[in-house]
Amino acid sequence: MPRKEKPIHTMEMRRQLDTARIYRQTVSLRFWKLSTGDIVELSGWIVKNGHWRGGTHTFLNPANGEMRKVRDITIFEYMNHEIYL
């Protein structure tokens, strides 16, 4: 299991996601799926866009073109950083 980095605030995660979107960098994150409570891991995905007011980000899998919209509040780990509110 990779080493955990220091925790970061939700707003810092959103800023980093927006920076990753601008430079088309890949990201890894873990979030809870609201309908079932399952933990979903996205590794090596590209940030397609973000909606600050809506509190969501859309991610693109470069391998197969799958897109997934994630609510920011459900993300609990971003790039090995735990997220706090």
Report the location of each language-model feature.
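Mixed-charge, Lys/Arg-rich low-complexity intrinsically disordered regions
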Residues: 2-22
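SH3/SH3-like beta-barrel fold
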Residues: 29, 57-62
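Short, flexible beta-strand-to-coil junctions
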Residues: 32-36, 62-64
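Short coil-to-beta-strand transition motifs
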Residues: 35-42, 68-71
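Acidic, low-complexity, intrinsically disordered interaction modules
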Residues: 38-53
